Amino acid sequence: MKAKLILENGVVFEGKAFGYLKECVGEVVFNTGMTGYQEVLTDPSYYGQIVTMTYPLIGNYGINLEDLESKEPKVRGFIVREKCQYPNNFRCELELETYLAQNKVLGLDGIDTRALTKILRNNGTMKGIIVLDNSNLEDVKDKLEAFSNRDAVSIVSTNEKYEISGEGKKVAIIDFGIKQNIIRNFVKRGCNVTVFPYDFKAEEVLEINPDLVFLSNGPGDPEDMGEAVNEIKKIVGKKPIVGICLGHQLLALTLGGETKKLKFGHRGCNHPVKDLINNRVHITSQNHGYYVATLPENMEITHVSMNDGTVEGMKHKELPIFSVQFHPEACPGPKDSEYIFDEFMKYAL
C-alpha cells in the first residue's frame, strides 16, 4: 500500500507502507547505524519517535528475540530506504516486516532517506506523520500540533519495584526507560540489583541502603522531570550516584547545571568521544536529543564529543558522582567504552 511521510514544514515523501498498516505521528529523527536496527526499535529512549535509518538496506539479518532492549518496540514509526525481502542469519527468527506487524508499528519503505536526513540535519528535528494512501489528509495539521511526548518516561518505566539477586554490591537503579543491556552489565559484575520506577521516593531508595545509585537512560526532555530532580537532590551526598544519558542530564539539573535541545540529536553507533582523563578517543553508541549545556564550578567535564564539543561525561570534584551522555553498554554499537561500568563500580561503597 502507498503511504506518505508529511513533515511539519510541509515536505512530503512518498513510499510504501509495511508492517502494521495504521497511520502514526511522532518526532522524526535519524540513526546513522549500519546495524542494530532491532535494538533501535526496542530502545525505550526512542519512545514517541519515527526513526529513519540512514543505511540504505535494513532487515538483512531479520529479528531474533534475544537481542531486544525491551519487551516490545518503542518507536512510533520506522523509515527505511529499502527493507530486505530475504533475511539470512542463523539467529533469525522473524522478518522485520512480520515483527513490526505483530507489534503494531508502521514502516515506510522506498523513500529517499538521504534527502530526509539532510532536511532534519539542516532544519532540525521536527514532527511528522505517516499516512496511508486512503487516509483523510484534512486533519494532518491538527494531529501534528496535538502530538506531545511529555509523559514518555511514565509509559516506558517499570510500574513496580523488582530485584535481581546477586552476591556483590547493592545497586539501586532508577528506571526512566532502561535498556536491558545496562541491567545485564551490572548483573554480570555480580551486583545485587533493585530497580525502582521513575516516580520513586528518595526514602524508598535509601531504605535498602544501596552501595550505588544508578540513573538510567530514557526518552523526552529532562526539564520535564522536576519531581525526579527533587528526589535525586535528597540522595546527593548520602550515596554515590552515577548515570547514563537522561540520567546524566538529570544529574546536571540536580547539581545546578542547564540542559538544552540539540538541533538534530546524536543517534548512531559511530560517535567519537574523547576521554579527557586518559586522553583517549572512543567510538561510542549514542541516542539523545538533549545535552548538558552548562555545569556548576564544582563539576569537572570528563568526556567531550569530537563532533560538536558537547559534554559527554562529568564528575563531581568532591562527591562520589559520575555520569556519561553516551551508551557504554552499546547494543547496538562498539564496546570501546564498556569500561565505564567498571568506573561506575569504583564509586560503590
From Swiss-Prot:
GO terms for biological process: 'de novo' pyrimidine nucleobase biosynthetic process; 'de novo' UMP biosynthetic process; glutamine metabolic process; L-arginine biosynthetic process. It comes from the Bacteria. GO terms for molecular function: ATP binding; carbamoyl-phosphate synthase (glutamine-hydrolyzing) activity; glutaminase activity. Pathway: Amino-acid biosynthesis; L-arginine biosynthesis; carbamoyl phosphate from bicarbonate: step 1/1; Pyrimidine metabolism; UMP biosynthesis via de novo pathway; (S)-dihydroorotate from bicarbonate: step 1/3. SMART domains: CPSase_sm_chain. Its EC number is 6.3.5.5. It is an enzyme of class 6 (ligase). L-glutamine binds at residues 45, 218, 220, 246, 249, 287, 289-290. Keywords: Amino-acid biosynthesis, Arginine biosynthesis, ATP-binding, Glutamine amidotransferase, Ligase, Nucleotide-binding, Pyrimidine biosynthesis. It catalyses: hydrogencarbonate + L-glutamine + 2 ATP + H2O = carbamoyl phosphate + L-glutamate + 2 ADP + phosphate + 2 H(+). Residues 1-170 are annotated as: CPSase. The active site is at 245 (nucleophile), 327, 329. Residues 170-349 form the Glutamine amidotransferase type-1 domain. Signal peptide: none annotated. Composed of two chains; the small (or glutamine) chain promotes the hydrolysis of glutamine to ammonia, which is used by the large (or ammonia) chain to synthesize carbamoyl phosphate. Tetramer of heterodimers (alpha,beta)4. Belongs to the CarA family. Small subunit of the glutamine-dependent carbamoyl phosphate synthetase (CPSase). CPSase catalyzes the formation of carbamoyl phosphate from the ammonia moiety of glutamine, carbonate, and phosphate donated by ATP, constituting the first step of 2 biosynthetic pathways, one leading to arginine and/or urea and the other to pyrimidine nucleotides. The small subunit (glutamine amidotransferase) binds and cleaves glutamine to supply the large subunit with the substrate ammonia. NCBIfam families: CPSaseIIsmall, PRK12838.1. This is Carbamoyl phosphate synthase small chain. It comes from Clostridium perfringens (strain 13 / Type A).
